Amino acid sequence: MARICLHAYVGGRVQGVGFRQATREEADRLELDGWVRNLDDGRVEVVWEGEEDRAKALERWLGRGPRHAEVSAVEVEQMPLQGIAGFVVRR
């Protein structure tokens, strides 16, 4: 299956609830590469790439997030592959 790269902004109660760490763990489970970070406006930004079915699985997961999160919006767009290796939480 082809690799794709996706970029998302996740809104709602997504900071201070373990969202970034949980996203990294889910991405690792799905064998995806990329990064996640908090934004000053309260959203979380995520860029990830991997096999299309796995990448789409993370997109679906972002719509729910971890247990204590309350996701109200997810904006996702496809972008060119970035050649990212590993998945990290950016500060």
From Swiss-Prot:
<dbReference type="InterPro" id="IPR020456">
    <property type="entry name" value="Acylphosphatase"/>
</dbReference>
<dbReference type="GO" id="GO:0003998">
    <property type="term" value="F:acylphosphatase activity"/>
</dbReference>
<keyword id="KW-0378">Hydrolase</keyword>
<comment type="similarity">
    <text>Belongs to the acylphosphatase family.</text>
</comment>
<feature type="domain" description="Acylphosphatase-like">
    <location>
        <begin position="5"/>
        <end position="91"/>
    </location>
</feature>
<feature type="active site">
    <location>
        <position position="20"/>
    </location>
</feature>
<dbReference type="InterPro" id="IPR001792">
    <property type="entry name" value="Acylphosphatase-like_dom"/>
</dbReference>
<dbReference type="InterPro" id="IPR036046">
    <property type="entry name" value="Acylphosphatase-like_dom_sf"/>
</dbReference>
<dbReference type="InterPro" id="IPR017968">
    <property type="entry name" value="Acylphosphatase_CS"/>
</dbReference>
<protein>
    <recommendedName>
        <fullName>Acylphosphatase</fullName>
        <ecNumber>3.6.1.7</ecNumber>
    </recommendedName>
</protein>
<feature type="active site">
    <location>
        <position position="38"/>
    </location>
</feature>
<dbReference type="Pfam" id="PF00708">
    <property type="entry name" value="Acylphosphatase"/>
</dbReference>
